[in-house]
Every structure is written in structure tokens, then in C-alpha cells.
Amino acid sequence: TGYVGCFPTEFIGSGSGSASMLAVALAYVAVFFAVGAVATRSPKQPGPAKKHHGLELLDASVGYGSTTILSIGSLFLSPGTAAGLVAPNGSGKTTLLEALSGQFPTRIRSGSLAADGICQRRSAEFAELVYLSSSGGADLYPTLSAIEHLAFVREAWKSAADIDSLCDSLGISPYLDKPTRKLSTGMKQQVKLAMAIATGCPYLILDEPLNGLDPGKRKTSCDAMRSEVARGRSVLISSHLLDDLADLTNSFYFIEAGTLVEKIKSSSQTLKQEYLDTYEGGE
């Protein structure tokens, strides 16, 4: 099983050239028909609420290939909390987020990862609980519309999300029918956040979700994330926008010399100063 965007597919192999291009084309076709079949369905009615216990990475080393880049004693996301991940570019933030998602099992070189007590090795069950929204446009199919993406993730994760209300709250309703290749960077970011919320997953891992947004749209996105946390979901957010992170999150993780370090909740000014002290020698 491979991935096209954020969606698992059996079509993707390890080949290259025309064979890989054909595989990707087939994956697009498969998703197109899947979306067409579910786009007009009503969401499933929610069943009894499930009790969540947290997402935990313990005594782990994280990296890629033969390289270990991070050591983690403990990273724990309890239900109904938001945490920030703060570090300069190239420190390993994205690698860590990929490891936490379970989509990239080779990122975890040692240690254990579990969501609600379900080990990442039980990948199908784990994938129902944890969703990664990656940076850039890798989560989006350029020829499919925003509403098709949302319908697909709602069905794939068997979610009861109210797509209309979600789109209204994020202000993306006016361009739902546009193919994502015609959307601006900010519009794509909001569609990706809507997709993450629409999955219904209790644990959302968001890589730079506020990049490319103007101040008004950043506030809208932060309000949406805050609402999901109030409903009991857990959110881990990487960002360089320290003011927004300080306002949104309960705690922070810094990456210091290849080690993940948890910080206490602090004000925006304190967080900025701690960032400067840690990474820029207190300038």
C-alpha cells in the first residue's frame, strides 16, 4: 500500500518513469469514481461517543534511511488539548510529524507509538484515529474540487461531519466547486484544514496549517481548531507564527540539539524570547 496525497492506495508502486505515471493516473481515476459515489451521500449518524486516552510516542528515535535525527523521551497528547511544535527549518519537525501519523512507519527507528492504546503496528485501526495534514499541496489532487476532497475524506473515515457547516465556518463555501489547482495557497490551506476536521479523527497532526494565510484567515483557522479542541479532539501544530501558537495551544515542544523538549504554557512574548534564547543566542 502506498499513498497519493493523504489517501492510501494499492495503485502506487516503487517503479519510475511511464509506469509510475500510469500508476498515479490510475489512482486519480480510482479516487474520482470513489468521490463521485459518495459526494451526495448524507453523513453517517454518530454512534455512542468513544472514550479517548491520548496519543503517545515513548522512548523513541526518529529519522529516515540510516540517519537518526531526533530523540524523544515522551510526547503525549491528551484528549482536548492543543500543542505546538516549534523549531527552525531543518530541525526535523516534518519527520517527527510523519512518524506520529503512522503513515511512515520507517520514521520510527526505536520506541513505541500508540493512540488510545492501539499500537501503530495495527495500522488500519491506528489510521482511523490519527490524521496528518502535510505542508505544501501533497494532500490535494489538482483536478478534483474542494467539495470532492471533503466528501472523500468523510466517507473514507466514516465521519459524521457536517460539511456545509464546516465550510461556512472556514469561509470556503464560495470556491468548493473549483478544482484545487485553481485555488490560491491560502485557499488550499483552508481546504486542507477542513479535510482534517472532516475526518472526525480524534488526533490531528497539522504541519504549518497557517502558512500563506492573511491575518483574518489565520484567525478563522485558529478559531476552527480551538472549537475542535473544545469538542475533545487533540491537535499538534507546527508553525513559526508564535503569536498564534501562544494563543491557541496548551503546551509547546521545542527541538533542541536533536532532542524533543516540552515547554510549559507561556505568553506570546515569553515564547518569542525563549525561541530567541534557544535558537539564536538570545538576540
Task: Give names to the regions the model predicted.
Residues V86-P88:
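The feature captures the beta-strand-to-loop junction immediately N-terminal to the Walker
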